[in-house]
Amino acid sequence: MPPKFDPNEVKTIFMRAVGGEVAGGSTLAPKIGPLGLSPKKVGEDIAKATKDWKGLRVTVKLTIQNRQAAVSVVPSASALVIKALKEPARDRKKDKNVAHSGNVSLDEIIEVARTMRFKSLAKELSGTVKEILGTAFSVGCTVDGKNPHDVQKEIDNGEIEIPQE
């Protein structure tokens, strides 16, 4: 006999989804089917919650309590950097492995670092900014027209001041 259903129990599920697209029922069913939820309905909720992240892969946090699913987006550093590039949404099925050759201002990088501060292991905001600069390098964009590695060196040498918080 299966265990009794506890209405106060909260289950949390993290999964990757493409922003603005309805996740396939086949990928959701094994995770949320046993919890008594409709995979199709949860897929539509995920698509609604991620419409701001169209075409980008983001982590979605499903909080399930009393057979109700609450969807929240947990963006990755790369998704935030790509969003800061303000590139138009592209067709995911046609374009694969696209290099993002745009330019991001240092202020936007600092904003992304503030958003990602809770995930960072750095002691100060400048360390988090350097983490995000590393992500910007791997995404392939420039920061204020310079290579992100050069900006990191300038922060280390004290040429660029990063606010404390």
UniProtKB/Swiss-Prot annotation:
Keywords: Cytoplasm, Methylation, Nucleus, Ribonucleoprotein, Ribosomal protein, RNA-binding. It holds the Pfam family Ribosomal_L11_N. It is found in: Cytoplasm; Nucleus, Nucleolus. InterPro entries: Ribosomal_uL11, Ribosomal_uL11_C, Ribosomal_uL11_C_sf, Ribosomal_uL11_CS, Ribosomal_uL11_N, Ribosomal_uL11_N_sf. The modification N5-methylarginine is found at R67. GO terms for molecular function: large ribosomal subunit rRNA binding; structural constituent of ribosome. SUPFAM superfamilies: Ribosomal L11/L12e N-terminal domain, Ribosomal protein L11, C-terminal domain. GO terms for biological process: cytoplasmic translation; cytosolic large ribosomal subunit assembly; translation. One of its GO terms (cellular component) is nucleolus. This protein binds directly to 26S ribosomal RNA. Component of the ribosome, a large ribonucleoprotein complex responsible for the synthesis of proteins in the cell. The small ribosomal subunit (SSU) binds messenger RNAs (mRNAs) and translates the encoded message by selecting cognate aminoacyl-transfer RNA (tRNA) molecules. The large subunit (LSU) contains the ribosomal catalytic site termed the peptidyl transferase center (PTC), which catalyzes the formation of peptide bonds, thereby polymerizing the amino acids delivered by tRNAs into a polypeptide chain. Component of the large ribosomal subunit (LSU). Mature yeast ribosomes consist of a small (40S) and a large (60S) subunit. The 40S small subunit contains 1 molecule of ribosomal RNA (18S rRNA) and at least 33 different proteins. The large 60S subunit contains 3 rRNA molecules (25S, 5.8S and 5S rRNA) and at least 46 different proteins. There are 2 genes for uL11 in S.pombe. Belongs to the universal ribosomal protein uL11 family. This is Large ribosomal subunit protein uL11A. It comes from Schizosaccharomyces pombe (strain 972 / ATCC 24843).
